[in-house]
Amino acid sequence: LFRSSDYMLAALASAVLPNLGVAGVRENVQASATDEAKGIDQTVIQDASGKLYDVYATDTREGRTRLIRRVKAAQTLAAARELGGLGFDMDRVVAFVPGDVSQPGQTATAQAVRQQAQAESTPLTPRKPGPTGETTVMIAVHRDGQARPLDLLTLDDCAAVGTAIGAIHRLPSTFLANAKYPVVTTGQIRSQLTVWIRRLRSAGHVPQEITDSWARIMDTEGLWSFSTCTVHGGFSDGDFLFSGSTITTVTNWQDMQVNDPARDLAWIFGKLDESHRNAVLSAYGRMMGSDRK
């Protein structure tokens, strides 16, 4: 059953790409709870030649920010040569329209300065309205697969997830540094945690025996023997798309960076029971232990 919003999204896609020739809409089986919570609608459209495209649209500030960052990440990944042979697809953006709104994330002061500069410019050039009004729209090549809640993954799904995360963590990180994404070292993580514990002690909001326990853990031998690496940034429902138990696509790379590999594994302790966690970690360990090529 198609929703009225599916046809609205198809109309927006036609406004963004008038030559696309939208012929219809398809059932969307890749809905993301995270996108929905931020006010992002999604549908699948088909053009006259049978090609499929994913269309995302939002009128909310949080949704705009998420889509803008997602597009930037997709463009960075598309330009990176290091990503060959991952074994799964990623977002491939065809078109993007940010909408006729102030830039998401821009402070009120920055907006005021921009508006003042525009007001003082002579002659005043009227701003040409965009094709989608205030609606932010992203169109991407449709990716095969179905979204699956992380807490409903099978053991085979979990093994595929562990392998995929390992493949991500083995990626050279140069492309992230070149694109100005965050690059954090192990030493910086330790320093940040040390400062955080010190501040908690000073504030007195946390019992001293707890902060003392954390400080002792910080000094545990071997705790800081890991190396930071390329990370996705943390997974939510809908970030993995599956065909059977094979991962076809990993999406939503907007938080990618060089950081603690645990960032990509933390979710398993809140979403999976022990046997499913072990399936993820075993596959991940095999991937990370294999010889680098």
Q: Language model features by range: what are they?
A:
Residues L17-S32:
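Conserved N-terminal boundary motif of the eukaryotic protein kinase catalytic domain
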